[in-house]
């Protein structure tokens, strides 16, 4: 892959309007309380891709597309076990989701909505859980779209 071809997309991302819209801790808190659902949503989509494109099972069978297998597994590895540092500065491994929750706690954002949602997912399943009123509307819309992709 020619990495220079990504420069326009990188510039576009670096100049995204979101970076001019968040001007205070209060605005960051609101953003994070919404965005955490997208962080979780991405993992759900990624795990679906892993399940469909990099099937796991026993007995193991070779996958003819090694590049795709590596690409998906590298993303999963980073998302599920990225480097983090504990309060003593020691290296630990944890998910991006957990790193995000830790950052939310650091700025004073509430994790109640996402934690309640995930508890409902575990106890009642995704379809009942996503009717939770505490999910911000834009997050609900994103998750509905992702679940449609996952189920089809």
Predicted region positions:
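Alpha-helical bundle segments that constitute or directly flank the non-heme di-iron/ferroxidase center
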Residues: 1-13, 23-61, 74, 78-83
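Active-site-proximal alpha-helical scaffolds that flank and shape metal-associated catalytic sites
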Residues: 70, 74-152
